[in-house]
């Protein structure tokens, strides 16, 4: 999900009727996302009888497909000046892509399904927020975006809850219910697409991404679909040489966020497989674990904004990264300890869930830091590069984590993750962030003061 912060000049627009009815399609698409978000490790390990190595491969390849797809769809939307059609393509295309699960009886056919899904699903990602902004007066942006975020999050949690209930009730039919969840998700996407076709308006005006330099997207949920569900700024090769070049400090900071995301994925990708393999975790346990992660992230979101204002960026980032290092270190120690499986499983589920609490702090602090380090006219370009490099970090971390965990061990993989994050934390703490501050902005639907 995404939140906005910033201020941009915009003209007066005609107020569409029943505009909050638009959000129904986004609600349904997030329900579908919640249903499928925990399924990759479950499908690969339980349904396909494979291992953590191939969970990493499936995760990284599907993530890799999303990066060029995001850029392609975003550029095509901007070139054609259309928004609604791409949301419909994303939702209806996801319906057809997920139905391919009926052919996914081997790893590579499953990966193929994920790739097709990512390519078509990304059609809606770079346009969803713009469609809302383009149909809303600037003074209403905070309220509209707050409601959009709330609706999207409700959909995500509803999907995870529904998945948890379904998989618990039909626990004895695992080999049927796992692919069936994809089919259910497909039809929810179909309903989202039909709803979008009926109720979504086309944009009343056009906002150029390059002029939205003070509007940024925060990733409230760290790993949904392995990529943001909505972004404003996308990376464009042809724009990198236009205007003033990015400052070295901005580029270096973005590279460090990529390194840290790489470290996060070294932990996140193998961990569900670890508790399945070593503790006998059930499908319900995995769904609960993902649900807790997302709930903790949402709980912390407003607190994170307050932390940046009160403590400052450096302390917020340091506190969050050090907390994650400590938690991952504890997880690595647990892999070498002999403890009763029951308590160890509950501790592990809580560890994974609680990690989501710190993502909100990290996400808001990173985006705010980049906006402060960048030249005002380059902020949009910098955020686009940041979004792309987060994807690169996720891809690389997902790919390598499976091999490390399978060939050397889960404990070693978690230790490597903690070390990588520690190195990134040390380097990122050296940045001076006392640069000219941002103007007034929007955060969770409220005007916020300048970030200290």
Predicted features, each with a name:
Residues 146-164, 387-397:
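Glycine-rich segments within core transmembrane alpha-helices of 12-TM secondary carriers
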Residues 27, 97, 108-124, 342-361:
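Hydrophobic core of transmembrane alpha-helices in multi-pass small-molecule transporters
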Residues 69-82, 167, 300-314, 405:
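Helix-to-loop junctions at the C-terminal end of transmembrane segments
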Residues 6-64, 249-290:
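Helix-loop boundary and gating motifs at the non-cytosolic
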Residues 85-99, 315-331:
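Structural signature of the two symmetry-related core transmembrane helices
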Residues 57-75, 291-303:
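Central cavity-lining transmembrane alpha-helices of secondary-active solute carriers
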Residues 2-17, 202-255, 445-452:
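Juxtamembrane intracellular "pre-TM" segments in multi-pass secondary transporters
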Residues 123-136, 360-374:
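Intracellular juxtamembrane helix-capping segments at the cytosolic ends
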């Amino acid at each position: 999900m995404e939140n906005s912060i910033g201020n941009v000049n915009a003209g007066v627009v005609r107020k569409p009727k029943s505009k909050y009815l638009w959000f129904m399609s986004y609600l349904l698409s997030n329900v579908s996302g919640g249903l499928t978000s925990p399924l990759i490790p479950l499908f690969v390990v339980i349904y396909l009888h494979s291992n953590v190595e191939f969970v990493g491969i499936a995760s990284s390849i599907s993530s890799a497909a999303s990066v060029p797809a995001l850029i392609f769809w975003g550029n095509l939307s901007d070139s054609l000046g259309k928004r609604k059609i791409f949301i419909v393509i994303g939702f209806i295309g996801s319906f057809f892509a997920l139905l391919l699960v009926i052919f996914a009886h081997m790893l590579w056919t499953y990966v193929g399904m994920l790739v097709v899904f990512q390519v078509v699903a990304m059609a809606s990602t770079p346009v969803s927020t713009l469609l809302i902004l383009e149909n809303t007066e600037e003074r209403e942006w905070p309220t509209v975006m707050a409601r959009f975020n709330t609706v999207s999050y409700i959909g995500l949690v509803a999907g995870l809850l529904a998945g948890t209930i379904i998989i618990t009730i039909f626990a004895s039919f695992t080999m049927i219910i796992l692919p069936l969840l994809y089919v259910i998700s497909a039809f929810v996407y179909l309903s989202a697409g039909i709803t979008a076709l009926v109720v979504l308006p086309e944009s009343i005006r056009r906002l150029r991404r390059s002029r939205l330099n003070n509007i940024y997207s925060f990733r409230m949920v760290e790993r949904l679909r392995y990529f943001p569900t909505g972004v404003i700024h996308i990376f464009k090769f042809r724009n990198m040489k236009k205007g003033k070049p990015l400052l070295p400090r901005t580029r270096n900071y973005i590279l460090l966020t990529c390194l840290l995301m790489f470290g996060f994925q070294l932990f996140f990708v193998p961990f569900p497989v670890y508790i399945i393999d070593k503790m006998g975790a059930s499908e319900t346990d995995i769904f609960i674990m993902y649900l807790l992660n997302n709930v903790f992230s949402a709980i912390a979101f407003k607190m994170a904004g307050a932390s940046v204002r009160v403590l400052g960026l450096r302390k917020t980032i340091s506190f969050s990264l050090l907390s994650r290092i400590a938690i991952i270190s504890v997880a690595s120690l647990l892999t070498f300890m002999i403890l009763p499986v029951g308590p160890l499983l509950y501790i592990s589920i809580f560890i994974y869930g609680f990690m989501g609490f710190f993502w909100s702090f990290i996400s808001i602090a990173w985006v705010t830091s980049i906006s402060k380090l960048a030249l005002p006219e380059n902020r949009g370009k910098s955020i686009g590069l940041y979004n792309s490099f987060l994807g690169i970090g996720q891809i690389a971390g997902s790919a390598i984590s499976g091999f490390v965990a399978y060939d050397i061990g889960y404990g070693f993989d978690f230790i490597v993750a903690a070390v990588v994050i520690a190195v990134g934390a040390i380097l990122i703490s050296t940045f001076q962030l006392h640069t000219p501050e941002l103007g007034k902005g929007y955060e969770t639907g409220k005007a916020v003061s300048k970030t200290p």
